[in-house]
Amino acid sequence: MASKIIAGKPDDTEYEIIEGESESALAAGTSPWMNSSTLKLRHRIGRGPFGDVWLATHHQSTEDYDEHHEVAIKMLYPIKEDQRRVVVDKFEDLFSKCQGLENVCLLRGVSSINGKICVVMKFYEGSLGDKMARLKGGKLSLPDVLRYGVDLATGILELHSKGFLILNLKPSNFLLSDNDKAILGDVGIPYLLLSIPLPSSDMTERLGTPNYMAPEQWQPDVRGPMSFETDSWGFGCSIVEMLTGVQPWSGRSADEIYDLVVRKQEKLSIPSSIPPPLENLLRGCFMYDLRSRPSMTDILLVLKSLQNSEEEQVRRGIDSREIRKSSATLGYTEWFLSKDHLQVRDTVRSRKPANSCKHENMDVPEGMVVGLERDSTDPDGFVLVKVHGVHDPLRVHVSVLERVTNGLASGDWVRLKVRKDKRHSPVGVLHSIDREGNVAVGFIGLPTLWKGTSSQLQMAKVYSVGQFVKLKANVVIPRFKWMRKGRGIWATGRISQVLPNGCLEVDFPGMLPFGEEHGSYLADPAEVEIVNFNTCQGAVEKYQHLEDFHWAVRPLLIAMGLLTAMKLGICVRKKIGRSKDGKQRDGSTGQGDCKIPDGKGSDKSKWLVFF
């Protein structure tokens, strides 16, 4: 392919490459589309799941100047004709929104060469991965890690503010400028091509590099959604690699990494020699539930504090937050709680414990914030809440409260009032709701968060770990494979985990594990119903539900029944034996005895005892 493209270009002419970048092509209102005749491919410098990276020369010429610049071209693999316009529009939107971002690679424009869409960007001499490869041990010093980390977190935050996910964070995608500043080299191509059919049907390759992928990236439609905190995982992996010089999950295949990260939920080993605030930050980046990970704003705050030699101050802050987490935040991480800040006149209520279906202690059933004792952004602050029927405001720690807007709060189970797209589940989990009622919801079947308004939602039944569920009677073909009992009856399972999009992981303790059927199953919350002793009608159903708790219940009860029958039989036999012995000694006849002739005219009689 390369030789074919280069063979068709005109002969090279002598020119001088100008150092630096002309801003003329980046002026406001300038179209990002570049004429392919101004681009001359030189040689390929890289290859990835979406296409090849080429070193090229861009020729700009007007009446006032004639310039040539070295550029890097990301040439995408062929895209279907009916999707080309969609892709071009996405990249033009990206181009317009990324102008002026200091920590993101400079985009020059969009073009098409031999029918392939190309993203043209400034050429950088090397990457952070290249620099690490040249160092002894392949790792960076802590000051360098913090410095580069601040640069990169700033760039990621800039792209997040424009609504883009990166999904492919790794040292080889972190470019270095002439003044040794880390630049974000991937502008979120996996995210932009998420719904575009490509030659490769392997979703793993399309959504990032396995060694740096978050759990939800492997199956975003099922274990998603992907959100900004998905990039926190990849960023954490990159920081660990900078500190250790070892690639995450080095030497493992994609299938092995999937088994470790998604199924077994194992986390990367974090160096113990780093400052506690950084260690705590990295542990947060590797939380399985993306809602419990730090946002890029939190990451940038911690890195800047460490970089400015304020480690002791940060340590005190983090430690105090850990105490609050264990005593007052009901199982939520400090990163989860830091994503929303209370303001005066907010409606609030007590926060229910994590993985619980109901509030255990409603100190504040519902009230209004009337005062802030400290800065609202302080995770250890207190607020004054006015509760109906209570004269004086209550002084409550912010970590035990959640903001309520239009009757909804983050973490609530919701259902779409009108389901327009049948491909995704109508039941999901609310991830965020702002004060204007704009919502973001995770649904099975959608790789990213669904955006809408609270008026489109209604409350749904709550599911939590430990509950038993079964498929509804009207479900003929479930979304996911489900266990069956004998005679083809759907089995009842127990929820072992609730994923961020409402997908339920279910195991079947009432079924004896055998072969490939052993392990967890998945369920759509819209297709199941809760089973407990209150919902069971009659003794038979209650006994059947008792068997759902463990496969050993039935054999245990059978064994106990047999043992009881044996003991009863032995007792009866002994009693009969004692009764016979007594009758033979005294020759008396008790009630229920019948005298039967022996049939031979003898005076002797035989006694038959009925028992």
Swiss-Prot record:
Chief location: plastid
Pfam families in UniProt: PK_Tyr_Ser-Thr (PF07714)
CDD domains: STKc_PknB_like
Boundaries of every Protein kinase domain copy: 39-306
UniProt binding sites for ATP: I45, G46, R47, G48, P49, F50, G51, D52, V53, K74
Biased composition (Basic and acidic residues): 595-606
Transmembrane segments: 556-572
Catalytic activity: L-seryl-[protein] + ATP = O-phospho-L-seryl-[protein] + ADP + H(+); L-threonyl-[protein] + ATP = O-phospho-L-threonyl-[protein] + ADP + H(+)
Record GO biological process: de-etiolation; positive regulation of protein import into chloroplast stroma; protein targeting to chloroplast
UniProt GO cellular component terms: chloroplast; chloroplast envelope; chloroplast outer membrane; plasma membrane; plastid; Toc complex
Keyword flag Transmembrane: yes
Enzyme class of the recorded protein, top EC level: transferase
EC number annotated for this UniProt entry: 2.7.11.1
Topology of the protein relative to the lipid bilayer: Single-pass membrane protein
Phenotype on disruption: No visible phenotype under standard growth conditions. Impaired preprotein import efficiency. Reduced seedlings survival rates after transfer from the dark to the light, a process involving massive protein import during chloroplast biogenesis.
Record keywords, A-Z: ATP-binding, Chloroplast, Kinase, Membrane, Nucleotide-binding, Plastid, Plastid outer membrane, Serine/threonine-protein kinase, Transferase, Transmembrane, Transmembrane helix
Annotated InterPro entries: Kinase-like_dom_sf, OCM_Kinase, Prot_kinase_dom, Ser-Thr/Tyr_kinase_cat_dom
Positions in the Chloroplast intermembrane compartment: 573-611
Cytoplasmic side: 1-555
Places the protein is found: Plastid, Chloroplast outer membrane
Region spans: Disordered: 579-606
Role this protein plays: Serine/threonine protein kinase acting as a regulatory component of the plastid protein import machinery by phosphorylating import receptors (e.g. the A-domain of TOC159, TOC120 and TOC132). Supports preprotein import and contributes to efficient chloroplast biogenesis, thus being required for survival during de-etiolation.
Family annotation (PANTHER family): OS06G0639500 PROTEIN
Family (UniProt): Belongs to the protein kinase superfamily. Ser/Thr protein kinase family.
SUBUNIT field: Associates with the TOC complex containing, at least, translocons at the chloroplast envelope (e.g. TOCs and TICs such as TOC159, TOC75, TOC33 and TIC56).
The protein's name: Protein KINASE OF THE OUTER CHLOROPLAST MEMBRANE 1
